[in-house]
């Protein structure tokens, strides 16, 4: 049978309701006939309408199981749009109409009978008309020769029934005479007792024999109906070319589905998308076309493949069904009109994160230990590494250890071992009594006691196909093989492993939870009960112990009433019910290639089913639709192709220019020079062309004149060059006619083709979000963005130079840290697979720098990145540049002048003078002088000024709370005096500060790493530098007392354990280092991004080259 699909009739045809209506009408009669056959009450209730329908419209006997069965088959066939059912119903309606017409013409009927016959005739004519109009909608075929086969079955059944009935009448004649017995049997079996009983002189046999005679006829009729309406079987499976095409699609897109390789199972049929870029494999069982897993191939072509598959189902009257679809596949099938229900979950192991340690893996760990103690080792090989003799032994083991007579599986099993086309499959063997081989592929000299075979999942995955173990294998053998496979995954190039499928996993899990409802518990109980035969719970638990990632799998169906039928088809397909003449596990059984003829004719496919020539397949399955690109991009791409066709290298190797643009403008006229940069403007005046060229130093005008160009013309320049292109030009400096200094170009070359247009040449990028996301474009067209990059670089250079001149050493300390400390902030968490260890991105380098101080590094600093998982606004970025510096034998007073000098030198480097740039109300930036000393205040003094009430370190907590309430400052009830003062400081002082000011002597309780004040109790030697509401830096007289340091960090660790995400953890290594004694030290921490922000007058996002942006 050729599986090419004719186009389906449009579903929105105005007569699309006819098949369903015909099926429902006949189905209602069949149902009522069946119920009336067993219920006298129903038979009495429907007697009047039944007799009317039976007399004038449709044969509707009061009791007939056979007729009800036949009508039910006819109704199903009509609903399935089978053409033979259409013919039967049409001919019946024509015959019934003719019968009514004949009765009307006789004129012997009563008025009531004539009215009934007129109504019946009208119904028949209407039915005939609608059936004729809807004829194209009945496209489904039945099996070839079904009509003749049904007639033969009916004739044979009737003949056997008559002969057997004749024999019964001879044995049990009753009062029936011998001469009547054969005729009586024929009347009861063949004519359904249509002959008047008076013809037999009132004689009749025993009632049981009489019933059996009628049953024989009914059985013959039912058998004929079954044969007549039976759906077409799929007699075509994979050919070599089909399998080769599928393997090619798996090479290109196999990473998407762990079950994709099972599409090469050879007892499946296949239907391809018209362009060959996707395919669906399936089997037909009990009239269900059962697809396995997701479509194979390009997800963009899945809809076309699904349409072709549904068209095929419609052509032959198959009910569509899908087993084992992923989320993406189920969505695609649902978009095509099917419904989806979750079957269960697939267990996925990620070797990078697989560990035997931890309480959750205790059962696996113990099982592995038992197996190893029993002398079991594991070896892993690709199938191609096995000799034919070794593979024969593997197949023998698989057959011997199988616990069923036949191989099971359909959607999640390959059904073969040892095929040369499957050379990339993995074989994992458990070997007992030997060394298991010194190398991974060494067979060793032991006895194989278990095996796993896994098929490829893309280029870096493996999906379990076969799992076998000897009855004599030690406990834990399977666990050992799975664990070793994960441990050696990197060596064999595997990053993901698909294990068994756990059906109804969520039901087992939810039904066992505390507080599960009665329905969930009952459903779980039923599954556990049936697991005695089907191992549902065993599969779930065998997978669950590995702590896998559960990936849902779905079954899809067209209509809810078809779920049982799809389920039966699945049971048959999976091998739980084996039918005669099954083609399971055979070699290529296909008679007709289903792959698109263009693909077959290309010659890239292989007749033996091996993978095709991939370069040819990529060409033959290329997307016919070009990518959707803006018009200007398409124009530039066309120019690029034209240049490449002419032999022009649009992206050549670099060659340094002799001058920058700025240097070229200042060069003498008679010096030949080279410049390179980006073209920003082009003005073409025919034979003369002007182009504005920009590099990092500035801009220079290019003048191209046809009379001076040594090669090409200005027309060649405009044909090849677009705004934004990178070019190099050679010539001498001169002047244009209007006196503009220009480079008189003699020849030029393209150094980089820009494929996307630049923004407006006058406005540039005006949207701030666009400037952040496309900083490279902003830098290319916006001189202000370049100035900010220069300013930032100048600030960093000035800070380093200032510290270098003071004798400081620059160091680098770890960014990945096991304990977050050095500041109170929420950290970012990451994980290192090599040590299976959670790590933090550092929030500050302080604790490591202090270790260096303990070691004798007296002046040290680090200028690097820190990370804090906090908010994002004009002054905060999760990733930022932080300066921390420590000077031995100094205190926090030393750093007041040191910090001011650093910032003033940075301002000089960026702005040329000691100024910050501040925006006015109209947005224009104006300089603000920051030279000279800066104001210094204590925290309590500043808060007192803001409150208008005096407070100090001795002010009690109730008084502070009362003042906070009066000022509208929120606080938490568990805060101490220091925390309340700090909250008032942040709201009343820090936010309102303008000129740079040092606020010193903070409460001790909010300064855990700072030494207590030398003369004032309750405060610590710490200052914060604030300017225009932004904290720029902080400095401490560092706490060097290791005992006090331990006490404070222990208090912080208690807060962290209590759920405070910003509290520091206890760093025992740091505390141990401090016990070796650190000299009296003054430490400085400064946010460089904020300093740049105030120096340039911009937000922090503008001053960072690439700030973190919210995903689109």
Swiss-Prot record:
This is Lysylphosphatidylglycerol biosynthesis bifunctional protein LysX. Its EC number is 6.1.1.6, 2.3.2.3. GO terms for cellular component: cytosol; plasma membrane. Binds 3 Mg(2+) ions per subunit. In the N-terminal section; belongs to the LPG synthetase family. In the C-terminal section; belongs to the class-II aminoacyl-tRNA synthetase family. Residues 614-1112 are annotated as: Lysine--tRNA ligase. Mg(2+) 2 binds at residue 1031. Residues 675-748 bind DNA. Pfam families: LPG_synthase_C, tRNA-synt_2, tRNA-synt_2_TM, tRNA_anti-codon. It comes from Mycobacterium sp. (strain KMS). GO terms for biological process: lipid metabolic process; lysyl-tRNA aminoacylation; response to antibiotic. Residues 1-613 are annotated as: Phosphatidylglycerol lysyltransferase. The lineage of its organism: Bacteria, Bacillati, Actinomycetota, Actinomycetes, Mycobacteriales. It comes from the Bacteria. Mg(2+) 1 binds at residues 1024, 1031. It catalyses: tRNA(Lys) + L-lysine + ATP = L-lysyl-tRNA(Lys) + AMP + diphosphate; L-lysyl-tRNA(Lys) + a 1,2-diacyl-sn-glycero-3-phospho-(1'-sn-glycerol) = a 1,2-diacyl-sn-glycero-3-phospho-1'-(3'-O-L-lysyl)-sn-glycerol + tRNA(Lys). It is a multi-pass membrane protein. GO terms for molecular function: ATP binding; DNA binding; lysine-tRNA ligase activity; magnesium ion binding; phosphatidylglycerol lysyltransferase activity; tRNA binding. PROSITE patterns: AA_TRNA_LIGASE_II (PS50862).
